Amino acid sequence: YHHHGYVEFDCRERFFDEGVNRDAIVYLTLANKLIHDLRPDAITIAEDVSGMPGSCVKPEEGGMGFDYRLGMAIPDYWIKILKEKSDEEWNIWEIWTVMTNRLPSVKTVAYAESHDQALVGDKTIAFRLMDKEMYFAMNRASENLVVERGMALHKMIRLMTIATGGDAYLNFMGNEFGHPEWIDFPREGNNWSYAHAQRLWSLSTNGFLRYSQLGEFDRAMIRLVKRNRVLQNGYPWRWNTDYDNKSQTFSHKNLLFIFNWHPTASIADYITEVPRPGKYTLELTTDDIRFGG
């Protein structure tokens, strides 16, 4: 575009009006053609906030030739509601809409956070949820309500993102185990310091800290999604959105997902519509003691 793509694409024509930089599209199309001709195994990903139609269609079919685009609205949304709304104000219908707002022809990479959140100037989701408590209350023996809430939401946000947000999933530099701090590369503004130009991967293997529980949840979540080929199955199917109880039920492939976003209520014997009658087995729960409860 001749702009940054942060406009209201309220009709199809907005993707093809005079705001479109046609020279840039030709260049990107030729670049994708060259890359895939030279390296058929290569994957190219568009960092495009608009979700332009045709961006992930082959050039021979009139598209730009990217394999995927980044679902940039998803991490922006999570940070927005964490910054601006209390738990009681979360709109579960809005969550569903943002997660599933993509064109079927544009294969989307879903992710909960990336450099916009992790680099200096913002906070990772884990740090925004738990802040200074992460420095002294991440020991497994500690009991801390801020950490318990933060870990619960961190797991739910990642699970919701991978289950509904796209056709691929991206972890980013330690968010799979809730890395606490930001990334800051050496520059004049920090006196060329390397102090934050790192990720402390040892946190995820330290058996005394809760980071390993968040990491174990991530591995279990990805195993479940890969085993059931959820990301190859298009869109999830919504069965229930209970605004009063802040609960959601949806299916994807042969999995049924039930989310309770309510900050205080745990509803016993909850009744919800399901795709088909029968017995269901519990494959994954964020409440598992292995994942920090």
Which role does the model predict for each range below?
Residues 1:
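Short acidic catalytic loops
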Residues 6-188, 194, 226-272, 276-286:
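Conserved alpha/beta catalytic core and glycan-binding cleft of carbohydrate-active enzymes
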